[in-house]
Curated annotation (Swiss-Prot):
Residues 203-213, 530-543, 605-630 have a biased composition (Polar residues). The modification Phosphoserine is found at residue 566. A zinc finger (C3H1-type) spans 306-328, 336-360. This is Zinc finger CCCH domain-containing protein 30. Gene3D superfamilies: 3.30.1370.210, Ankyrin repeat-containing domain. GO terms for cellular component: cytoplasm; nucleus. ANK repeats lie at residues 90-120, 125-157.
Length: 716
């Protein structure tokens, strides 16, 4: 134990060392000789401080009985400086020394037998006994503090550095429980540590870095120390730095910065470009190290649920976590932003409020997810439904590749995760029907009588939609892969440089062009050694009409195919799968097709509409059945004989000689027929074509159809 006394034995020698005599009492004894002068001093106060440090109760009692006033005296004590590891000489009382080393018995003796001042401050640091007990690091410091508090110690007294006893607590590293108990005992207002500003002093190497001032001192001052001597602050005092008014900062409550789009996708997401110090709370952009930083919900797929690991301090997954990090990511998430009403209503004074202030500002909630973002699965089903309905007016991608959100982030996989919320809902009353024109096997007999007379209007609307959608589809086919067989053909047609809008129109309305394209397409398939399933090219049968009724107009079917220019290996393999599924129905479809073709021929003998013309379907449908509105599906024996002769495919060419005898062309009619077949647009623009011209065009289409049927039968 290191100690020192406040009164030292001083020996004055004039020339040489002489023997020194010590007296038993405390008086100064001077022996004077003619040649020598000796001064001897002795002090027992140093022994009292040492006795107090060693918890020697009997020695302290004897010293107090000998001189009761020595209890309140202060003497030099060599020990560790408070708040550091440096050893210095400073003035201490016996009670301070006993409190520093945890001498419980000596403290009880001093406070019980004498009138010692437990709140006395001395030394250069103006410390008290309670400061010494808190900073001494004794194992039994809790009992010492309780004794001093019971004796009347004031825990609000400040030392020379403006610190209370609770601000200078030092305990061994393994005694964290003692530290917490001391914090509870020495709290200024009796509350817990988490509810007040509390500093814990750590050991520092020198005095220059030790001063630490309380942030809430009685004098209202505050201090700071060096990084080595700065204490650990359990709760920081709220303090906002004042910045000069910056007119260049945008107003986050007005203009574009207050819109839902900016708040959800850009607020505290985009980095700030200002290189000078400014108020981050007034800036809508993110800064390095800012706690309000958000991940872009269009690039990082996370929910609005708070991350439990992030609440504890850090999330090991970082930006790849599927949960929200922080309040801003949670409440500014598109699934939760402004889905609830603010309790303050229109009187809300928050700079950035996460809630809606009026019912009109509420964002819609989706029943499938309970949030403001549609379900990813429901959107996938919606996209699949659109791909199955090529004629749907909404048959576009769920989120256009040209949208600002898709172009801004440069990531295609985020388009399905964050679709636009204004996509209309899809209602499919006939969802049990297969809408693909190559697979449906609907018959005209299945159509009710009251709907049969409306088929012409449906087909006219279908053809008009088909032409208009073909013009607008070329822009999106580049970025959207074909989803089915019909998309494959339409993609090839829209990407072909040799077809313009007029060519697409002629492909829709010209039977001659369709026949030529179909023949060329069959030749390419033969080169790939594959077989194409029978494609219905019957322009007069009700089957071509009921497709337009149930599948809707919009995309070009394989009957309207333009010339493909890309390699057909991948496409033919896909078509071969369709062929396997249709081979079982091939014979039945051919017979039904031939039957309807024969019925159409007999019908044209009496009334001569143009076969397959979209503009004259009213005439065709009105003359199909009897006058009472009921369709007449009967046929004569003569027609059956002609059917047998025309259905024989033993020869190289079909027997169509009886058709040649029905019509004799005049030179004028031949010219009109050539003009009609050369341009599909010319036929479309004639609301009431001349009857002979219509008849020739229909016969030509029927002949081409029969040739195609024969080619298909030969391949089978």
């Amino acid at each position: 134990m290191c100690c020192g006394s406040d009164r030292l034995n001083q020996i004055v020698s004039s020339r040489s060392s002489l023997p020194i005599s010590f007296e038993e009492d405390n008086n100064l004894v001077t022996n004077t000789d003619m040649n020598h002068l000796t001064v001897e001093t002795e002090d027992t106060f140093a022994s009292l401080l040492e006795l107090a440090a060693n918890n020697d109760v009997e020695g302290v009692r004897l010293s107090i009985e000998r001189d009761p006033s020595c209890v309140d005296e202060a003497g030099l004590w060599y020990g560790r400086q408070k708040g550091s590891k440096a050893m210095v000489n400073d003035y201490r009382t016996p009670l301070m020394v006993a409190a520093t080393y945890g001498s419980i018995d000596v403290i009880k003796l001093i406070v019980s037998l004498t009138d010692a001042d437990v709140n006395r401050a001395c030394g250069n640091d103006q410390t008290t006994a309670l400061h010494c007990a808190a900073s001494g690091g004794a194992v039994n410091a809790i009992q010492v503090v309780k004794l001093l508090l019971a004796a009347g110690a004031d825990l609000n007294l400040l030392d020379a550095e403006g610190q209370r006893a609770g601000d200078v607590i030092v305990v061994p590293p393994k005694l964290e429980g003692v530290k917490l108990m001391l914090q509870e005992l020495l709290s200024a207002d009796g509350s817990s540590t988490a509810e007040r500003n509390l500093r814990v002093v750590t050991n520092v190497p020198n005095r220059s870095s030790s001063p630490c001032h309380s942030p809430t001192g009685e004098n209202g001052g505050s201090g700071s120390g060096s990084p080595l001597g700065s204490p650990f602050k359990l709760k920081s005092t709220e303090f906002k730095k004042e910045y000069p008014v910056d007119p260049s900062l945008p107003d986050i409550k007005n203009s574009i910065y207050a819109t839902d789009e900016f708040r959800m996708y850009s607020f505290k997401v985009r980095p700030c470009s200002r290189a000078y110090s400014h108020d981050w709370t007034e800036c809508p952009f993110v800064h390095p190290g800012e706690n309000a930083r958000r991940r872009d919900p269009r690039k990082f797929h996370y929910s609005c649920v708070p991350c439990p690991d992030f609440r504890k301090g850090a999330c090991r997954r970082g930006d790849m976590c599927e949960y929200a990090h922080g309040v801003f990511e949670c409440w500014l998430h598109p699934a939760q932003y402004r889905t609830r009403l603010c309790k303050d209503g229109t009187g809300c004074a928050r700079r950035v409020c996460f809630f809606a202030h009026t019912p009109e500002e509420l964002r819609p909630l989706y029943a499938s997810t309970g949030s403001a973002v549609p379900s990813p699965r429901s959107n996938a089903d919606y996209a699949a439904a659109l791909s199955l309905l090529p004629g749907s007016p909404s048959g576009v991608s769920v989120m256009s590749p040209l949208s600002p959100s898709a172009a801004g982030n440069g990531m295609s996989h985020s388009n399905m995760a964050w679709p636009q919320p204004n996509v209309p809902a899809l209602h499919l009353p006939g969802s049990n029907l297969q809408s693909s024109r190559l697979r449906s096997s609907l018959n005209a007999r299945d159509i009710p009588t009251d709907e049969f007379n409306m088929l012409a209007d449906y087909e006219q609307q279908q053809l008009l939609n088909e032409y208009s959608n073909a013009l607008s589809r070329s822009g999106r086919m580049k970025s959207m892969p074909p989803s089915n067989l019909e998309d494959l053909f339409s993609a090839e047609g829209s990407s072909s440089p040799r077809f313009t809008d007029s060519a697409l129109a002629s492909a829709v309305f010209s039977p001659t062009h369709k026949s030529a394209v179909f023949n060329q397409f069959q030749q390419q398939q033969q080169q790939q050694q594959s077989m194409l399933s029978p494609i219905n090219t019957s322009f007069s049968s009700p089957k071509s009409v009921d497709h337009s009724l149930f599948s809707g107009g919009g995309r070009m079917s394989p009957r309207n195919v333009v010339e493909p220019i890309s390699p057909m290996s991948a496409r033919v393999s896909m078509l071969a799968q369709c062929v396997k599924q249709q081979q079982q129905q091939q014979q039945q479809q051919q017979q039904q097709h031939q039957f309807r073709s024969l019925s159409s021929r007999e019908l044209r003998t009496n009334s001569s509409p143009i076969v397959g013309s979209p503009v004259n379907n009213n005439t065709w449908s009105s003359k199909w059945g009897s006058s009472n509105g009921q369709p007449d599906w009967g046929m004569s024996s003569e027609a059956l004989g002609k059917l047998r002769s025309s259905s024989s495919f033993d020869g190289d060419e079909p027997d169509v000689s009886w058709v040649q005898s029905l019509v004799k062309e005049t030179p004028a009619e031949a010219k009109e027929k050539a003009a009609t077949s050369s341009s599909g647009e010319h036929v479309m623009k004639q609301p009431n074509p001349v009857e002979p011209v219509m008849d020739h065009a229909g016969l030509e289409a029927w002949i081409e159809q029969m040739q195609l049927d024969q080619l298909v039968a030969q391949q089978n």
